[in-house]
């Protein structure tokens, strides 16, 4: 992108990553914001001292400078040191179980691995959990990306926003409530 400098940063260490390595996308340039009006705290969280804006997108940059957005940082979990994408797991569950917009993936704390995937599914969703998990394993997903059988939770309905998208804040709040019940 002409006039825009980008870099990919490891979300844990803050180190700049190399070509095709997945991390947080930072950018700066004349058309990139320099801060939040009258909110220095928010500005310091979003803008680095050298002027790069944290997009909160997980991305890679190839040797030609092409940026590939993988997802939003808020839609990833860190499980046993690996970044695990909620949205990709959600799509795979929806595809394999024929459950369009009837599932939502979030995470809750896990003492051993950092976080644990949880799957909420709408009461109207009809599927065989054991069969779905087998299909997920057979589809080539890494084991860390496959939720445990005891981490599927039925809800009346998946919370939705007025625009028809999943209400991810409510989904994450539901996962937080689960963790409060467990820990």
Walk through the language-model features, giving the residues of each.
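Conserved AMP-binding/adenylate-forming
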Residues: 1-59, 63-64, 74-76
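Conserved C-terminal "lid"/linker of ANL adenylate-forming enzymes
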Residues: 77, 106, 118-120, 135-183
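Structural motif
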Residues: 51, 97-100, 156
